[in-house]
Amino acid sequence: MWQEIEGKRRTTPSRMMVSIFQMEDLTATMTRLTGEFRWEMCRRVQGPRWNDVSEPSLTSEYCDYIQFYKKNHELTADAKDKIKSAMQKAKNSYKEMFVRDYITWIMYEGNSSPRLNKVARVIIATYCPFSKAIRDRLMVNPMYKEMLEKYNLKMSQKVHHIDNLCQKLNNTKIEIPEEILNQKKF
């Protein structure tokens, strides 16, 4: 169980609760909980446009991928069959489908064991990236290399933007907020 915000104030910290008498694997439970939280938080932030492809987000791109997987030329026939059966197992729930892919992403793909198809991997990697240490380890694998190079390029552009912002703040003798420095480190 989780709570992404308290009431109408969106700046409150989230809460996640787990049963005291946990019978399942705690890692799997927390991974599932985090996946559900990411999905719902994205929906909360996007508001009514959570599945509108004109505003790229985790939920919009993932819903688009699931809705139009039959027309996607990047997927093989076998991958399309797997998506169809996975959707039946998830009872046609985009959220449940994402959570299952997220668990696979964290548990297997993070250990260089590819299980997801290319399209799902790119979407999840874009919005749910691994830490720097795991990304560096995955960079050796050719399956992840191109995707991670694009991610690194995108992040270097953001870092450049943050550097420019820090320079402007230094020139005006304003203290740089800790959040900006933390974003730069990530």
Name each model-derived stretch:
Residues M1-F186:
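Active-site-flanking segments in enzyme catalytic domains
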